[in-house]
Amino acid sequence: MTSEDHAQHDGHAHDHDPTFYRSPRDAAAGPPEKLAYVAAFAKPADKPDAIAVVDTDPASPSYATVVGFTELPHTGDELHHFGWNACSSALCPTGDHRHGDRRYLVVPGIRSSRVYILDTKQTPTSPQVTRVLGPEELGKRAGYSRPHTVHCGPGYLYMSCLGGANGEDGPGGVALLDHATFDVIGQFEHDRGDQYLAYDVWWHINDGVLVTSEWATPSMIEDGIVPELLLGRKYGHRLHFWDMQTRNHVQTVDLGDQHQMALELRPAHDPARKYGFVGVVVSVEDLSASIWVWHEDNGQWAATKVITIPAEPAPAEQLPPLLQGFGAVPPLVTDIGLSVDDKYLYVSCWGTGELKQYDVSDPFNPVQTGSVRIGGIVGRRPHPARPEEPLAGGPQMVEVSRDGKRVYFTNSLYGAWDEQFYPDGVGAWMTKLDVGENGGISFDPRFFLEGNVFRGRRVHQVRLEGGDASSDSYCYS
C-alpha cells in the first residue's frame, strides 16, 4: 500500500497526514519506513553534531548507507533523543489533525539545552534547520534545562528536562511547547508533589494519566557516573503519575533505592491496556538489571518486577577501572522497546553486549524468545558482516518498526559515560535485526554501518520515517 493509497483509507482522502493512525493495528498495517533519522554527536565537541539519514529500503541500491547528513549550526550540543512535531495523537478527540503533519524533527541538545527544529518535508534526505531555541528560552519560560525526551501529544509537545534553569540541578520536569510555532509555553507541572528528579515522560492518553521516571540531575551525570552517589543510592528509582488535565502530581511509586536509574517508559500502545514497562539500569546489591510493569492495583498505581537480568562474572583485568572491584559485568539495561502490537519487548544490555526479545503478551509473565550478542565490555563480539572485527559499545538505543518486523539499534549511551565503561573507545555503529514470524531475532547481514560513515560522530537515537514504536500514541484500540 502506498502513502497515497493509505490516504484514501475509509474514503477520507487527505483529511489528515497519512502517517497518523487511529489505532496500533492501523499503524502496523501502514507502509514500511524507507528512511531512518539518527542522532550523531561529536565527542569531543570539536565539530557540530548532525542528523544522519540512513536508507532502510532493502530494494534501494543505497540500502544501509548514510544518504544524508545535516550538520547543526553550533557545537557542544550532544544530540541524544528527539521526536516529531506531530503524530497519531493528533487524531485523538482532544487533538487537532487539521493544522499539522509529521514534518518537523524536534531535536534537543542534552548538553547545550538548545532545541533545533528540522524540516524533513522538502527533501527528506536533507532535513533543514528552520529554528533554533536557545537555552535561555527554555530556562526563562519553563525553568528547565538539559532537555531529553520529546513526545507529540494532543495540544502540546511534551519535552522532559533533567535540570533547572541554566543547567542548575533542579527540579527537572516537563516543558510544554506549541505544536505549530515551537514556542516554549511553560512548565507542565502545576503541583509537582515530591518529584525532583526527571528523565522520561509518556502517558495513558485516554485516561489522562502522565507518567515520568527518574535518572539524575545534571551534576550527577555530566562528568560521568559518580560511584559514591551510585553506591549511596542517590540516582533515580521512582515513577511519578500525574493528572494530565490539572497537571497535578497524583502518586509516587518507589521501586526501592537499590534499583538505581529507572529510565525508559514504554506504555502499552493499545489504549485499553493500562500498563507499561520501565527498565532499571542496575541494582547496587548484585549489579543485576530489571524490568518492571506498572499497573493499577485497587485504584492505585503499583509496579511489579517481572524480569531480572544478572551480572556476568569477568576477570578484573578485563574490566574498566569503574568495575574492577566488582569482578563482574553489569547488563546495564539502558533502553527498551515495545512492539506496536504490545507483544514483544526488546531489552538493550549495553554492558554485556546483548539485545533480548521477550514475549510479553502476558505482561506479568514475560518469556524470552530471542537474543543476539554484539559488542560488550568484555565480549567485544563482532557483527556477522565483519566477523574479524571486535566491536566496542553494545546494543543501546533500540527502535522497532511499526509492523514489528525490524529492530534497529545503535551503540553509544551518553558521551561522558561511554568513556567510563569503554575507556579504549566506544566507536560508532548501527545495525538492524529481522524478527521471525513467531518470535526470534537475527542480524540482517546487509545492514551494518560503522565508523567513518558517521564522520567522526557517535550515534544514539534512531527515528523512523512515518513513525515507529516509541514515537506515537493512539486513542483507539
Which residues are covered by each model-predicted region?
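Asp-box/WD-like beta-propeller blade repeats and closely related beta-sheet repeat scaffolds
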Residues: 119-205
